[in-house]
Amino acid sequence: MRWINFSLPGSGRQAYGTLDENDQVREIRGIPWAEHEFTGQRHGLSDVKIEVPVVPPTFYAAGLNYITHIREQEALAGRKVNVPPQADIGYRAVNALVAHEENVVIPEDATHIEYEGELVVVIGKKARNLSEAEAMQCVFGYTIGNDVSERVWQRADRTFWRAKNSDTFKPMGPWMETEFDLARAQTRVSVNGEVKSHFDTGDMLFNIPTFLSRMSRNLTLYPGDIVWMGTDGHSPKLDHGDTVEVDISGLGTLRNTFVRA
């Protein structure tokens, strides 16, 4: 099932709904992973504004989780390839989230912006101490993220506080899908209509159950939490006016334009 978080232009009202194959949104009262009911109202997709699928209680990020991306980042830093020995998790900031079709604002002092197309896991149940066999039971669904990064800041700063978390640096959407075949999924990232990255979405060093199981040994996972699963391949430098599309088969396409502040 495809779930969309939307608002109605001019009214300020925001709600969730299901999206069908005819681009009709069937509105609910409540949230998808908890108690809810259909209101009887329907909207055309073209008549609503798509919002960020969820503003999470906690925003997790897997980081280096695909081998080609690891090799690229280590080469840029002048280091030998160091493959992570275990599934360690990081954090991102919710202030950076923007929705499908919203602009990514390049800060005035930023000099090297890149995209990172990622699969995003949405948690649907409170969970602690999960085995890998149990881990997928807490997953509600999936969406798409673009982990926008300023590479100069990433290398120069002690943390990723601005390189990864500046306002608008985390586009996510356009919706959540509960039925998703990771084994068949392909991730393609295009800049101005030209494919720049293409990889098997499931070709991760550490898969989703491994991450969720390891995380839940020390952290309680809550409904609405999100886990970004990393990216692969090379990302070109982006400039003012570039439009980036992250397409994951079975999920859809996340589209954002980059503009200089």
Task: For the regions a language model picked out, list residue spans one by one.
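N-terminal non-catalytic cap/leader segment that marks the start of a structured domain
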Residues: 1-83, 180, 194-195, 245-247
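Catalytic-pocket segment enriched in acidic/His residues
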Residues: 48-53, 69, 151-261
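A generic local secondary-structure boundary/capping motif
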Residues: 49-51, 77-79, 104-113, 127-134, ...
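RNA pseudouridine synthases
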Residues: 65, 123-145
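Structural signature of FAD isoalloxazine-binding scaffolds in flavoprotein oxidoreductases
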Residues: 78-99, 115, 245-249
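Ligand-binding beta-strand-loop-alpha-helix segment within the catalytic cores
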Residues: 100-102, 109, 117-119
